[in-house]
């Protein structure tokens, strides 16, 4: 059985890890052994934060909708309840965008919600 020398594969693996660690500070960016751990940890953070990002954006949308609804004399909770009763199926992302960029349209939605809650 022939002898296997691993110089090429090892160098390729090291290059790959160091490329992923590009921009890291200190030895984390240029020493393979340290960079390997840093890249693994970065991957864990990336995996975790891809999930956290969804929660953070939802919180942001709700905060924006709440602020806009309060300007129109309602709380977010009342507004959400009224949307359901009025069968208005607009998601939070779109509602927050409307609230930020087109307050007149948001006010008309609030008027529809208030009318449905009053009835």
UniProtKB/Swiss-Prot annotation:
Alphabetical keyword list: Ribonucleoprotein, Ribosomal protein, RNA-binding, rRNA-binding
Pfam assignment, any one: Ribosomal_L20
Coiled coil spans: none
CDD domains for the chain: Ribosomal_L20 (cd07026)
Record has Ribosomal protein as a keyword: yes
GO molecular function: rRNA binding; structural constituent of ribosome
Keyword rRNA-binding set for record: yes
UniProt record, GO biological process: ribosomal large subunit assembly; translation
Annotated family: Belongs to the bacterial ribosomal protein bL20 family.
NCBIfam families: rplT_bact (TIGR01032)
Descriptive protein name: Large ribosomal subunit protein bL20
Highest classification ranks of the organism: Bacteria, Pseudomonadati, Pseudomonadota, Betaproteobacteria, Burkholderiales
Gene for this chain: rplT
């Amino acid at each position: 059985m022939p002898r296997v020398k691993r110089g090429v594969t090892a160098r390729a693996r090291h290059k790959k890890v160091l490329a992923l660690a590009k921009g890291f500070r200190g030895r984390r960016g240029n020493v393979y052994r340290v960079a390997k751990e840093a890249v693994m940890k970065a991957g864990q953070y990336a995996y975790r934060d891809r999930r956290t990002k969804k929660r953070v954006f939802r919180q942001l949308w709700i905060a924006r909708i709440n602020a806009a609804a309060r300007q129109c004399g309602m709380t977010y909770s009342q507004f959400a309840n009224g949307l359901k009763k009025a069968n208005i199926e607009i998601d939070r992302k779109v509602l927050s965008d409307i609230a930020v960029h087109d307050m007149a349209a948001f006010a008309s939605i609030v008027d529809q919600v208030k009318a449905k809650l009053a009835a």
